[in-house]
Structures are given as structure tokens and as C-alpha cells.
């Protein structure tokens, strides 16, 4: 609750500052010039959220995760956002966890907190009725675990889905053990997990 209240206060402050800088056009504009890991574009009542690390196939690293979490908190505190569209720039929606960051958390407790409290899956689940995720290219690990929480998922016919964690002796860390069986059933999820 404290985290949500802090996020709401930060979002209010951000909106106020951006209104002062931009006039009353809104608080989310296309920021491609700055190379942000997540781009936000407000179009009326719709917030477009784009994963923006195409050179890394939108690998789900710390910066992208934190920026995505911030972006997904906006519709929770701004009731004028009726719809969220989440997609990815470049050839893939999301290639899963950023392998350059694996094993870099200082301890197991921090890693657990990041997985259970710091990820985007819970926010996507909370926004399920208002969010559409558009998938293309490769959707690996977090790239399918998080979208599976959404109310509407649209995938290009050539999209490739993979959950390699189990074959590496790991548990899917972005909520896939919950989201994927709920979305496609436990038997299909099991097949996806072990193949």
C-alpha cells in the first residue's frame, strides 16, 4: 500500500511538472530521442507503452523492468486512462531476462523481493480488463509470462513462445507459473515449460 501511495504521489508530481513544461497536452509523450527503455505515448484515453531496447530484443533487465513498472502504475492512479496497449520495438516483443544481469542481485532476499514485489506481472494482472498486449517475434520467459496476465493478448502468427527456465533448472521468475496455466491451461503450460 505504501508503495502504491508513493507511486501515486510521484505520478501526480510528474504530471504537474510535465504540464508546466508542455502545457495541457498531457503527461506522456513520445520520448524516442532519449533512448528510454520504455516509451509512453498518450492518445486520448489510451496509453501506448512500448518496450524500447530493440538492440537487445527488449531483454527484461533492471532498467526496462523498472521503467515498465512505472509506466503500468500510471493507469492505476490516473482514472482518465481507460486503455493500455503494450508492445515491443524491433524484431521481438521481449527475449526474456537480460542474461548480462543474471546472478547480479546482492543476495537471495533481494532477488526474492524483486521477483515478488518489483515485477510488472502483478500490475498487468491488476489492469487485466484495460490492457492489450501485442506480441511479435520471440516471446521468451518474461516475454510471455507477463503478457499472459493481460485481459487481451494479440500475437502475430509467426510469434515464437519459449520458457527455457525449467530446462536450465530455474523457476519462471516473472509470474509464469501462475499466469500461463491460467491463460492456456495446466497441460499446455506444462508442455510449454518442458519443451
What are these regions (language model features)?
Residues 123-195:
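Crotonase-fold acyl-CoA enzyme core
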Residues 15-89:
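Conserved CoA-thioester-binding segment of acyl-CoA-metabolizing enzymes
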Residues 64-68, 116, 146:
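Hydrophobic alpha-helical membrane-association signature
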Residues 57-58, 100-103, 190:
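Nucleotide phosphate-binding site architecture
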Residues 49, 86, 98, 146-148:
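Hydrophobic/aromatic residues within transmembrane alpha-helices
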Residues 1-26, 175-195:
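Crotonase-superfamily enoyl-CoA hydratase/isomerase domain that binds
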Residues 88-123, 139, 169:
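Glycine- (often His-adjacent) and acidic-residue-rich active-site loop
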Amino acid at each position: 500500500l505504501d508503495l502504491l501511495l508513493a507511486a501515486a504521489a510521484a505520478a501526480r508530481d510528474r504530471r504537474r511538472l510535465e504540464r508546466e513544461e508542455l502545457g495541457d497536452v498531457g503527461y506522456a509523450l513520445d520520448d524516442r530521442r532519449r533512448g528510454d527503455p520504455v516509451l509512453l505515448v498518450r492518445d486520448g484515453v489510451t496509453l501506448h507503452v512500448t518496450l524500447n531496447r530493440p538492440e537487445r530484443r527488449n531483454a527484461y533487465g533492471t532498467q526496462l523492468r523498472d521503467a515498465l513498472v512505472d509506466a503500468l502504475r500510471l493507469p492505476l492512479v490516473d482514472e482518465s486512462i481507460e486503455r493500455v496497449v503494450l508492445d515491443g520495438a524491433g524484431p521481438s516483443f521481449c527475449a526474456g531476462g537480460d542474461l548480462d544481469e543474471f546472478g547480479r542481485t546482492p543476495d537471495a532476499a533481494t532477488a526474492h523481493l524483486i521477483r515478488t514485489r518489483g515485477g510488472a506481472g502483478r500490475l498487468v494482472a491488476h489492469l487485466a480488463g484495460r490492457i492489450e498486449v501485442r506480441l511479435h517475434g520471440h516471446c521468451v520467459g518474461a516475454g510471455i509470462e507477463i503478457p499472459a496476465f493481460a485481459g487481451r493478448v494479440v500475437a502475430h502468427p509467426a510469434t515464437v513462445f519459449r520458457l527455457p527456465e525449467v530446462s536450465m533448472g530455474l523457476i519462471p521468475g516473472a509470474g509464469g507459473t501462475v499466469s500461463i496455466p491460467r491463460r492456456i491451461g495446466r497441460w499446455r503450460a506444462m508442455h510449454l515449460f518442458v519443451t
